[in-house]
Amino acid sequence: MKQYLDLCQRILDEGVIKEDRTGTGTTSVFGHQMRFDLSEGFPMVTTKKLHMKSIIHELLWFLSGDTNVRYLQENGVRIWNEWADENGDLGPVYGSQWRSFTGRDGKTVDQIQWVIDEIKRNPDSRRLIVSAWNPAELDKMALPPCHLLFQFYVANGKLSCQLYQRSGDTFLGVPFNIASYALLTHMVAHVTGLEVGDFVHTIGDAHLYLNHIEQVKLQLTREPKPLPKLVLNPDVTSIFDFKYEDIEIVGYESHPHIKGEVAV
């Protein structure tokens, strides 16, 4: 995907060295946007192999409202292990905010159900937004949300989605985020009777950890391969009923995996 490789090249060319929470160090740019036409193929990075199983299970986990890593571990997904406590809990992270956002008055809102209902009721609304950024609960979270707000947009029978991500680990995290929100857009379009439009990915602090520089340079030498297709089970009518086997990526071909250490 040229859009992703262009981001990597921009960070290498223009990035500013910054200290970070993990002590690893980054090179960073501020404010970058990528746009993917979802009708042209499913946007999975092909210049290294992605573990789509982890992406699908993580999204299903978010949508369930769960915030304990047990489900992920039972399905061979370890991407949240470093942040979980001894009981596997992460505090009120994404799933909690998506499905039971708690306001100052103690009222909870199922934002996913609300936004799907609102797309059906009022597709021209400019308020089709889900936020995972709850300032009152940030200190209870194992990790404050990086991909923190997304907005849907309906035009000409097509559903588009824009994500705002405050912080993007461009080598390890951003390819996952692109695929995850593209999948979410397909799923929401499916249950609202719409076609897919664009996925727009806006990143605030887009960075490369300094111990990922050589891996990214290797990726930039590789020619992107054709994008795969996404197939969803047509019998599923509720977004909360999707299971792993209802989601299939067809024709994914990639260059070999490139290892990179996670900065915790």
UniProtKB/Swiss-Prot annotation:
(6R)-5,10-methylene-5,6,7,8-tetrahydrofolate binds at residues 51, 169, 263. Its EC number is 2.1.1.45. One of its GO terms (biological process) is dTMP biosynthetic process. InterPro entries: Thymidate_synth/dCMP_Mease, Thymidate_synth/dCMP_Mease_dom, Thymidate_synth/dCMP_Mease_sf, Thymidylate_synthase, Thymidylate_synthase_AS. Disulfide bonds: none annotated. Homodimer. This is Thymidylate synthase. DUMP binds at residues 21, 126-127, 166-169, 177, 207-209. Pathway: Pyrimidine metabolism; dTTP biosynthesis. One of its GO terms (cellular component) is cytosol. The active site is at 146 (nucleophile). It comes from the Bacteria. Belongs to the thymidylate synthase family. Bacterial-type ThyA subfamily.
